[in-house]
Amino acid sequence: MLKPLGDRIIIEQIQSEEKTASGIVLPDSAKEKPQEGKVVAVGTGRVTDNGEKVALEVKEGDSIIFSKYAGTEVKYEGTEYLILRESDVLAIIG
């Protein structure tokens, strides 16, 4: 499994609907980039200027909303993940 460093987290994106409410199938080019995901791994935390380590607020299993163009997409063992910094997380769902 991938292990993020520092204040980074790894998420699996929750894909958006392929149909509209009225039943129209959307092509890939018309879909918005997903902004929801499930946290699958978290780093050890960020280090402050004075050397203290601050634990992350998100934890494995959290569902989150993140900034639209945040993170780096990676593919590992056939699964696509997004690696982003905790500061790119806008909210924890639930």
UniProtKB/Swiss-Prot annotation:
InterPro entries: Chaperonin_GroES (IPR020818), Chaperonin_GroES_sf (IPR037124), Chaprnonin_Cpn10_CS (IPR018369), GroES-like_sf (IPR011032). The keyword Methyltransferase does not apply. It comes from Shouchella clausii (strain KSM-K16) (Alkalihalobacillus clausii). GO terms for cellular component: cytoplasm. Heptamer of 7 subunits arranged in a ring. Interacts with the chaperonin GroEL. Coiled coil: none annotated. One of its GO terms (biological process) is chaperone cofactor-dependent protein refolding. This is Co-chaperonin GroES.
